[in-house]
UniProtKB/Swiss-Prot annotation:
Conditions for induction: Silenced by the DNA-binding protein H-NS under standard growth conditions.
Lineage: Bacteria, Pseudomonadati, Pseudomonadota, Gammaproteobacteria, Enterobacterales
Quaternary structure and interacting proteins, as annotated: Type II secretion system is composed of four main components: the outer membrane complex, the inner membrane complex, the cytoplasmic secretion ATPase and the periplasm-spanning pseudopilus. Forms homodimers. Interacts with GspM. Interacts with GspE and GspF.
Protein's name in the database: Putative type II secretion system protein L
Source species: Escherichia coli (strain K12)
Primary localization: membrane
């Protein structure tokens, strides 16, 4: 290892504290917890403060499997945004995407809101820490095909359920996930919760801090979100700055000359582009009046990307977050089928208005509707047909 390294693990909704540890050529520190007496700024004097790997909790990330038009399709920040746009819970936000795997026309990506990533980087920069890599928390957990890896964190469980799928759930939601999608194999650090089991015998290890599984010898480069507009610029010398300014000045003069000689042709081109854009929009409105779109009409006509039905882990996270915010609702039973595109919940509530409010709050990510109430138990059935 060429230099000291510090790994910082951000807090999450279920785990309120930050953690950190350091690596050097001849030693590895234990896992430490930040407190009011030991804030983030106190790490600026520690070894590795100039080479920080930041771990972001899975709750702030999106995982998507995308299909390209063809194997040679050029992937850029813009084309990734187009491909993922129909699957976003809120397409008004600007998302930053990282390709973690590509097999022919199939692409696995991880997304984070650009504003959120900027806040993370600004916070560590203000604390005097130099971030050189940003990774999803959980990417360092050991994993094998058709298996889960679980780490007990006292208040929650850190989970790696697939090659590029990481999440953090409390015990209640972990039990729901395991009941609906039991894995073939399971590796567990800590005592496995009651009702969580795999098809094959459990591989059990003593409980340890999840961060202690991080390895400084593994690059984790495929998961690094510090790229594109977030990539750090190298320092430029004074002579380099002067040459850069000269080059920019020459380029500006060349552009002005080109614009001056081609202004009429450019004006006609822009006018034609506006006409074509308006024609495409009119055609889109004629065929798809219920879907509002303002750009990239040809791409969506060709691909006709439909809203994907949510995968189990992010769906459970949405439900978990919603129920934590509304204690007047209690989940009694959940039945989920991604194949049949259906979700059925049995819920109890203080009043029917609480159930109506729950259905209203789910409209942005998975519309739910109440169907019936058990006259004896008072339990409501809420479902989504997936159609």
């Amino acid at each position: 290892m060429p230099e000291s390294l510090m790994v910082i693990r951000s807090s999450s909704t279920l785990r309120k504290h930050w953690e950190w540890m350091t690596f050097s050529a001849d030693s590895v520190s234990s896992v430490h917890t930040l407190t009011d007496d030991l804030p983030l700024e106190s790490l600026a004097d520690q070894p590795g403060a100039g080479n920080v790997h930041l771990l972001i909790p899975p709750e702030g990330l999106l995982y998507r499997s995308l299909t390209l038009p063809n194997a040679k399709y050029k992937l850029t920040a813009q084309t990734l945004q187009w491909l993922a746009e129909e699957t976003l819970p809120d397409n008004t936000q600007d998302w930053h995407w990282t390709v973690v795997d590509k097999q022919n026309e199939s692409v696995e990506v991880i997304g984070i809101q650009s504003e959120k990533l900027s806040r993370y980087l600004e916070r560590l920069h203000t604390a005097g820490l130099n971030v050189t890599r940003v990774l999803p928390d959980g990417c360092y957990l050991p994993w094998e095909v058709d298996s889960w890896t679980l780490v007990n964190q006292q208040t929650s469980w850190l989970i790696r359920s697939a090659a590029h799928a990481f999440n953090e759930l409390d015990e209640h939601w972990l039990q729901h996930l395991a009941a609906q999608f039991p894995p073939e194999n399971m590796l567990c650090y800590g005592v496995v919760p009651h009702g969580v089991a795999a098809a094959n015998p459990l591989i059990q290890h003593p409980e340890i801090p999840s961060l202690s599984l991080y390895s400084a010898d593994i690059a984790f480069q495929r998961y690094d979100m510090l790229h594109g507009i977030f990539r750090k610029q190298k320092t430029v010398s004074k002579s380099g700055k002067w040459l850069a300014r000269l080059a920019v000045s020459c380029l500006v003069l060349a552009i002005l000359s080109f614009v001056g000689s081609r202004s009429i042709a450019l004006w006609h081109t822009l006018k034609i582009e506006d006409q074509l854009q308006q024609q495409q929009q009119e055609t889109w409105q004629r065929y798809f009046p219920q879907i509002k779109r303002t750009h990239n009409f040809r791409f969506y006509f060709k691909q006709q990307l439909a809203q994907q039905y949510p995968e189990a882990v992010p769906l459970l996270y949405h439900l978990q977050t919603l129920l934590l915010e509304h204690p007047e609702l209690q989940l009694m039973e959940a039945n989920y089928s991604q194949k049949q595109k259906s979700l059925t919940l049995k819920m109890s509530a203080k009043s029917e208005a609480n159930i109506d409010r729950f259905c209203e709050l789910t409209q942005s990510w998975l519309p739910m509707e109440k169907t019936e109430k058990d006259p004896v138990s008072g339990v409501w059935t809420v479902r989504n047909s997936g159609k």
